[in-house]
Amino acid sequence: DMIITHRPYDYHRDHRYTSQLVMDASYMLIVPHYFGEFPPQTREMPVICYAFDKFKNPKPFQIDVLLNIDDIYEEKVKAIAHHESQFFEWLPWTIQMENIITEETDLDKRLELVGMVLNNNFGPISEQYFEFLKTAFPGKKNVSFEAFEICEYGKQPKKSELKKLFPGAYFTKPGELDKYNK
C-alpha cells in the first residue's frame, strides 16, 4: 500500500497539516489494540511518498521516483479540471486573474488553464533534468513528469516493490541527479 501526500514544507497550511497528519497517523496503522474495535489490517507500514514541489527550504525535494506521464497527461488535466473550486475559483483569485474563468467559459479554455498550472508546477522537472530524462526515458517526448520522494516515516521499499507501485518509472540512485540540481 502507498500514501501520496505533500511535504511538510508546503506553502498551504492544509497541505502542511495533511502531511503531518499522515506521518502521525501512519505509525498507528500497525499498532495493536490502539482501537480495539478496529484491529490493524496489516502489520506492514505503507510506503509514503511526497508529491513534487519546488520548495528549497528547509530542504530541497529529493527525486527518488520519476514517472513519465506523456501518454496520460491529457487524462490528468481532465481529471483535475473536475476540482472546480480550486482550479477555477480560488487559484485564479490568488493571482488576480479571477475574471479569466467565468461560468460561461468553455471546457477547452478551462483545460488550457489547468494545463498552465500543471506546467508551472511540474515543468521544472523536464526543464532541469532534460538531458538526464532523454537517457532515463529513451524514445519518449519527455514533456510531462511526476516525481516522488520516499518519506522516511513510511516503509522503505525495495526496488521490486517500487516497480509494482510505479510501473514504467525510473528510480534514481543516491546522488545521481546532483549535477543537475541548481
What are these regions (language model features)?
Residues 35-44, 55-59, 64-182:
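C-terminal accessory domains and tails appended to enzymatic cores
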Residues 1-35, 42-44, 50, 61, ...:
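Active-site beta-strand->loop->alpha-helix modules in alpha/beta enzyme cores, enriched
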